[in-house]
Amino acid sequence: MSQTNNAGISNTNQNNNRKGGNNKNYQNRNNQQQGGQQHQGGQQQGGQQQHQHRNKHQNQQGQQQGQQQNKQGRGKTPLNVESFPINLSQQQVQQLQAFQQQSQQNQSAQFQSNFLPPATALYTPVINYFINLYNNFKSQSHQDILVSYDSFFKSCETYYPHCALPTIENLIPILGDKFEESSFTDRFFVLLYKEIYYRYYYALVFQPNINTCVESWQNYYQIFHTLLSANSPNDVEIDLPNAWLWDLVDEFVYQYHTFAKFKLKKQDVDFLSENPEIWDTTNVIRYLYYIIKKSQIFSANTNRFESSSEDFCSHPVYKMLGYYSVISLVRVQCLLGDYTLALKTLELIDMGKKAMYTYVTACHITLYYYLGFAYLMSRKYNEATKALNTILVSVASKSKSQNFQSDHNEKKTDKMYALLTICQALYPNKIDENVSNNLKEKFGDKLLRLQKGDLTVYEELYTFAAPRCIGPVPPYISGFNVTALDPHRLQLSLFLEEVKQQSLLTTIRSYITLYSTISIQKLAGLLQIDPEDLRVKLTCYKHKLFNVLGKGETKWNNQLDIDFYIDQDMIHIDNRLYAKETDSFINSILKFEGSLTPSYNWM
Amino acid sequence: MENDQEQPQQEMEQEQVDIELSSLQGQERIEYINTLIADSYNIAIAKKLEEFLDIQINENIYLFQANSTLLKLYQFNPTHLNKDSIAKMLAKALMNFPCNDFLFLSYMIPSIIQKEEPLLKLFILNNFLETCKFKEAWSHINSHSFFSEIPSFIDNIRNFISGVLSITYQNISITMLGELLNLSDRTQLVEYIQSKQPTWKISDSTVSLQSDNSKQKKADTFTFDQLSRILPTFIK
C-alpha cells in the first residue's frame, strides 16, 4: 500500500511540473467554464475521467494490483487530467515530507493509520464539481445539491484516494468574486466543506491524529453554534438535502465514537486534561439535545399565536436535523449501555410506514439496527426479531443504489442478519421467507451451532454484529484500568451469561414438541439429567418466556412456540403448531371470500 | 450562546436541588423527583437521588428511572461512585422481578465492582433467581443479613417465585411448594396459600396453582375479534 502511495505522489508531482500550472492559470480556466454549462461539463469530465481511470489500470499498474484496488473503489489518481499544484503551507510541506520519509522507512501501517498527507494538486473535474456544489448550494434546490454532493464525493474518491482533500483555503480562490466573506450562506458553506474535509479524513484513516480530531470538533462546534444562535428561521438562508443532514449528524456521532475508542498517548492525555470539552460525552449529548430543542419538532403547535414561519420546525434544515439528532441520541445511549433510555427515546419517533426516517436509507438502517440491538439486550427477542425482520424486508426490496454509502449499508445489513440469527436461536419466531433464505445463506451453519448451544459461536456473532460499546469517561479520568472497565466486554459477558442461563432450554423445547404429555421422570431420562434439575429448567423456561413476552402480553401469539404446564409429575404440552384450528378456519374463509369478491365487481 | 441557554437553566436547577425531600409526600415527591431526573447529566442531583433511594427502601416504594439516573451519574462522574447505593438499587431491582431492571442496571456497572462485595452477593442471588434455583436462592438470602434488613425484600422475592410457579405448575405437592417458598412451617405455608385465594387452593397434599378459568384450552374458543373478521362474509 505505502509503495503505491508514494509512487502516486511523486507521479503527480512530475505531472505538475510538466504542466507548470500556477494559481492564475486555473482561475482563468475556470472562468471559461463557468458559462452555465458546468453541470454538463462536470458530467462529461466524469465520463472521461472514468475512461482514463480504466486505461490507467491497464497501462501503468500491475494487473493484480489494479484489480485489487478497483474492488476497493479507490484506484490510483488518474494522471491524464489537467491539474494545478497547490501551494502548500510551511506546515503542510513539513507534514508531507515527514509522511514520505515515514512511508519509505517503515512499511508498517502504524504511521499511516493516523495521518493523511495533504493534497498536492487540484484536478479540473474536482474543481468543476466543487463549483457545481457551491452554485447549487446557493440555489437551495434539494435535488441539485444532492446530485452535486454525491458527484463531488465520487470525484474526490477518484482523485484523492490516499490523501486528504484540498483545504477550503485552497478552493476559495476558485470561486473568485462569487464568494462573499460577509454572506451568511457563504460562511456556512465553508463550515460544511470543512465538515466534508474531516469526514473524508476519518473515512481514510483508522485513528486520526489528535490535532485533526480537535479541529473537527471545533468545526462541529461552529456549525452547531451558528445554527443554535439563530433568532429566527428566516435568518438561516440555507437548505440542504436530507441525505447531507443525516451524514452530518451521523458523522458527528461516528467521530465521537471513534474518539472514545482511542488508546490515548501520554501527551494526548495531557492535552485533553486541559481541554476536557473536546469530544466529551456530556457535550456531545448536550449538543444533540440542544438541536432537538431548537428544532421544536416535539414542542411545536402548542402556544402559537405567532405566524408558523417563526417556528424553527417549519425550516426543513432544523426540522430534519432535530429528527436525525433523536436517532443519533438513541445510538449514543445504546453505545453507553443505557437500553431503557434508548427505547424510551425511540418512543418519540413515529414508527409508521411513511415515517421520516425512511427518507434516507442509511438513517433507516441505523435506526432499526440500534432498535433491534436494544431489544436484544433487553431480552425482548420477539420484538428484536420483528424490528430486524421489518428492516431486512425493506432493504431487500430497495434497489441497490451505488453511492459512497452503499458499502457501509451493506456491512450494517450483514450485522443485522447476524443479530437476527441470534434471536432466532434464542427464541424461534416466524420471519419473512426471503429474509429467512438470506439468513440461511449467510449464517445457516452458525444457526445450527447456536441451536446446539455453542457459546463460542454466540460470542463470535455477537462480536461481529454488536456495536462497540464505550464508557462515558476515558479511563484516565475514571481511574479504572482499561481492562477492568471495558464496557464492550461487560455487555458481551452479560449477554453470554443470559445464553448460558438459557442453555438446555432449546433442547427441552425440541423434545417436548414431540409429546402431548410426558412424565418428568421420563423426560429427565431422555435428557440424561436429574429430575429435580429438570423441574428447575422447566420453571426457568417459563420464566424466560415471560421475560420475552413482557408483562402486558398474556397471549401466546408465537406460532412456532409451545406452551406447557406441570401437573405434579406430569408435563402437559399444548402444542401451538396443531392448535390453531380456529385461526386456520377463519383465514380460509377470508381467503376464499377474497378470491370470490373480484368477480362480483366485474359483473 | 451556550451561556445564554445554560444560565437560567442552572439557576432553576439550583432552586430545585435546594428543596428538602422530607418536606414532600407521596405523589408530590414523585413529581419532584421526575423533574429532577429530567436533567439527567447534572451531578448536583445525585445527593437527592441517594436520599430518595433510602426513602424507596424504607417506605417500600419504587421508581426505576430515578435509580438508573443515579447510576448514570456515577457512570459519568466516577469519583462520586457510591457502591452502597448501587447495592441498594440492585436490591430494589431484585424486588421488582421478573422485570429486567437488574439486567439494565448491570449493563452500566463496571465489571470489576460486580465481582466484589457489597455487590457480589446481589449478583449471585440474581443468577439463582434468573435460573430459577429457588432453594439455593433462599439459602443465600438467609446467610446474608443485608437482604432481611430491607423491608419487604423477602415478601417480594416470595411473590416473584409464586408467580413463576403459577405459570408453570397446575398442581404441586405441598411439601415441594413449602421448600420453594422457604416456608417450612406448615401453618405459615397454609396462611400464605390462603392469602393467594381464590387462585390457589389446597386439596389434601397438593396445591392447585392455576384458576379453573385458565385451565380451559384457548384453542377451542372464539374471541369476538376473530369472529368479527368473518361476519361481513355471512351478512352477504
Provide a role label for each language-model segment.
Chain B
Residues 1-62, 76-236:
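Charged, E/D/K/R/S-rich low-complexity terminal regions of large eukaryotic assembly subunits
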